[in-house]
Amino acid sequence: MSMPGFSYDGGFAQYVTVPDADANLVKLPDAVDFTDAAGMGCRLMTAYHGIVEVGQIHPGDWLVVYGAGGVGLSATLVATSAGANVIAVDIADDKLALARKVGAIATINSRETDPVEAVRELTDGGADKSVDALGISETLHNAVNSLRSRGTHIQIGMTAEGPVGDVALTINDLIAKEIDFRGSFGMPAVEFRYLLNQVAASKMKPGQLVTKTIALSEVNDALTAMSTYNTVGTTVITDFTR
């Protein structure tokens, strides 16, 4: 698998090359503006595949999302547009405020409240589905433990490489509760059609995730802020003249 920004140059430019463009280049519908398109990016596509295709979310499902960064906020937006009841968990109040703006019906600051107990109370026993959008031991365990019996966990956040990224799970608990544990990675190009139809019909508005626009010359500062988790929502390059 090859991906822009990993296998070849990314898209921080007015013009980019697209290998195998007949499969990898997708025409933007006229009804989708550039802000919504930029708000989609890797994070929303990854969340869409995890929530809709892998997680098989349904209207009325209780979903708890651990992490309100790019992927977590996108998961909240996607699940809300599908009719789910979303609970967002994070340690930053500004990120939780944005989660509410894009559809979360409840938010939990896990620095102040036991998130597992809070989710169980809000859902009368446990969520139907959970997402770990971070990929660290604490959020993974809390996400799984927030589920009701026969609940489904969707693991989107990737752990660190090597032994340091290994996470031990209490398998007997998963067996006893008959938990369905599913991994989700990226989004195949074939799903673009369904995602873009949702956006074109205004059933989903990725532009809600865009909180800042910058010039190309400001990219390095933006990436530094992202690497230290000092951002909220999505930053989009709109000025390529400087």
Per-range role (PLM):
Residues V32-T113, E117-A118:
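Mid-domain Rossmann-like dinucleotide-binding core that forms the NAD(H)/NADP(H) cofactor-binding site
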